[in-house]
Amino acid sequence: MTFLKKGLRLLFAKHLEGWRRAVFLVIVWIPLGVIMFVAACNLWVIGSTHRFIAKDVKSARVNQVALVLGTSKKVAPKRANLHFRNRLKKAKELFNAGKVQHLLVSGDNGTRFYNEPQDMRDALVNMGIPSHAITRDFAGFRTLDSMVRAREIFQLDSVSVVTDGFHLPRAVFIGRHFGLDVTGIASDPVPLRQSFKTHLREYLARVKAVLDVHLLNTPPKFGGEPEPIMVSR
């Protein structure tokens, strides 16, 4: 009987130790691995693109076209989106400085009531940009879509991309992966209290970008026939 009790105790102890190891793996090593993977992807995206991002308009490279990445015009019915305003302001600065001759505004037009490219065009025209110097891409549902379509649909080999500073590395990373000679210029920063969640999401979005281009081979939502941009001023 004593022998049986000892055997049961040993068996129980082995199972308990196994459970402890499993719990330790789940609680510590798996989350640690995820954190390290997220960090590695972010370092890759940022580290491989920083040299292609201009410090200001003066140092920005001259290109025929600037790609302005879309966002919503408002964040609430009576509250303007500062990301929207600042991106267009920077695009206007590039245009007026002679750094670009044409603006490609790319964004979400998922419903008849939501049209980022049209909102961007209307705002830019009100800011003094000639309408003939603006092309709309109505299928820029994601950053990947906008970058790939700039290359494949609008037949651009080189482009200056305008968006928020935290967003630029991902845009440049995706564009250059698909053979687009991309340089970036950051719009003026939005106060962190109004953009904190967006900054946090970007850490995971960079991971998704790495997976999209190097593992999943994710295509844009919509393709189409080539529509080369004819630059005139």
Where does each model-flagged region fall?
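A structural signal for short, hydrophobic/glycine-enriched beta-strand patches
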Residues: 3, 7-11, 41-200
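Residue-level signature of transmembrane alpha-helical entry/exit and packing/kink sites
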Residues: 21-26, 194, 198
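Short linear elements at protein peripheries
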Residues: 63, 217-233
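A transmembrane-helix-recognition feature enriched in membrane-embedded lipid enzymes
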Residues: 199-218
